[in-house]
């Protein structure tokens, strides 16, 4: 049967690919002239299942107050007085305790680990190239307290069977040789050897090309006005003077999902603004090998073939996409501090994007009360990490297959009292 996927970012394109592989007729609609031109364009480039964790964590409320007075703070808040922003922040605050943190991180790691496996299978079956590396990820600690706090995350990693190594400062250069020059600034690190890296935009573009060759129709330059509904069904997508109809619809509009679903499904997906730099490599020996995460500044530094991607920070400022010079200076400060010989920072390209974040950090994947509407949104800073797994999972749900991982706690049910995700609505016409 015919499924319309709304959105051509990495999550939308992955959804389209796996739906097509399941035998569905698929149309992708997006306002941009091509795939991965908004949030997926220049993210941090890391595929880090073990580091999948919610921003809502114990201690964050107090840290947020402290960060208000710091020049290089990882989180910034600008209150706009809207009910949406205030409600979202209150919901996030309610998740900032140990019980919720462990629960949320556990399901995020589960989906992210599955997604990495799906990406590996896709890579092996198609040969897709995206400047990918399988060199692991290294989280860097600058204080003894950060090193000691790693035990909380290690408990989740152990419960999920994720391999890891806790390293002292003197051992960091074994993983990232260039850090030998700055080891005296660090107290240690947590390495996850199974993590990966890659250019998300390049991956999405090539997967879209493969999907198109397989029969997926892409409707670019097509802004969506609204979804048309009657009773408990969606009957079309209004795009200007045109109404595009299908048997099923998948919402993968990222930060714009909430507004597009207004009056249909209430989901708390908020735009969390982030920034990145893309830097040409100057000295191979001074550049990162894979990805490092600076725990203090919440910034990732990732190696592509001939470039370094530096990404991070979070601003709760609504849909503001202004490029702020102080944020660029923070990214430059961190990469100069850790990899002073690595790149031509004066040639860096500065970018910003809006990550679709839920209050608990977990994406919203699965069916809704509407019989032919499914969601695949709210992946926050982990869209690249979770895209393939979310796409495969959603395809299985829509096609009536039994997914490979537990999925009910990923649904919109946690924000919709009384809604039960277990009774699936299968689209006929897919391969069994």
Curated annotation (Swiss-Prot):
Presence of the UniProt keyword Ribosomal protein in the record: no
Listed pathway(s): Amino-acid degradation; D-alanine degradation; NH(3) and pyruvate from D-alanine: step 1/1
Keywords annotated in UniProt: FAD, Flavoprotein, Oxidoreductase
One GO term (biological process): D-alanine catabolic process
One GO location term (cellular component): plasma membrane
Lineage: superkingdom: Bacteria
Protein family (similarity comment): Belongs to the DadA oxidoreductase family.
Record-annotated disulphide pairs: none
This protein's name: D-amino acid dehydrogenase
NCBIfam families named in the record: PRK00711.1
Native source organism of the sequence: Cronobacter sakazakii (strain ATCC BAA-894)
Gene that encodes it: dadA
């Amino acid at each position: 049967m015919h499924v319309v996927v709304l959105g051509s970012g990495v999550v939308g394109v992955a959804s389209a690919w796996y739906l097509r592989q399941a035998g569905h007729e698929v149309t992708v609609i997006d306002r941009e002239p091509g795939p991965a031109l908004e949030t997926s364009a220049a993210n941090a480039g890391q595929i880090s299942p073990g580091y999948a964790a919610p921003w809502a964590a114990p201690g964050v409320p107090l840290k947020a107050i402290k960060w208000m007075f710091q020049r290089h703070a990882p989180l910034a808040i600008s209150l706009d007085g809207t009910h949406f922003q205030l409600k979202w922040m209150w919901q996030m605050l309610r998740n900032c305790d140990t019980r919720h943190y462990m629960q949320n991180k556990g399901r995020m790691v589960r989906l992210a680990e599955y997604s990495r496996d799906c990406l590996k299978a896709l890579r092996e079956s198609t040969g897709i190239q995206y400047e990918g590396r399988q060199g692991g990820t290294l989280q860097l600690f600058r204080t003894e307290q950060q090193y000691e706090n790693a035990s909380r995350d290690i408990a989740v990693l152990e419960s999920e069977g994720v391999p890891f190594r806790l390293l002292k400062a003197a051992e960091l250069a074994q993983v990232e040789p260039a850090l030998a020059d700055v080891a005296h600034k660090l107290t240690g690190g947590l390495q996850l050897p199974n993590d990966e890296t890659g250019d998300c935009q390049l991956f999405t573009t090539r997967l879209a090309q493969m999907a198109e060759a397989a029969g997926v129709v892409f409707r670019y330059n097509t802004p969506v006005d609204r979804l048309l509904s009657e009773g408990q069904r969606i009957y079309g997508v209004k795009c200007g003077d045109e109404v595009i109809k299908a048997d099923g619809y998948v919402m993968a509009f990222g930060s714009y999902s909430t507004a597009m679903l207004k009056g249909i499904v209430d989901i708390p997906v908020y735009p969390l603004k982030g920034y990145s730099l893309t830097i040409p490599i100057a000295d191979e020996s001074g550049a990162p090998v894979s990805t490092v995460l600076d725990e203090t500044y919440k910034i990732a530094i990732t190696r592509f073939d001939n470039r370094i991607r530096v990404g991070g920070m979070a601003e709760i400022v609504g849909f503001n996409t202004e490029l702020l010079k102080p944020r660029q200076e923070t990214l430059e400060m961190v990469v100069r501090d850790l990899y002073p010989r690595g790149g031509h920072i004066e040639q860096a390209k500065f970018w910003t994007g809006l990550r679709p974040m839920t209050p608990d950090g977990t994406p919203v994947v699965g069916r809704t009360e509407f019989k032919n509407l499914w969601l695949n949104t709210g992946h926050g800073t982990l869209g690249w990490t979770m895209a393939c797994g979310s796409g495969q999972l959603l395809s299985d749900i829509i096609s009536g297959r039994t997914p490979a991982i537990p999925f009910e706690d990923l649904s919109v049910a946690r924000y919709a009292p009384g809604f039960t995700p277990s009774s699936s609505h299968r689209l006929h016409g897919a391969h069994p």
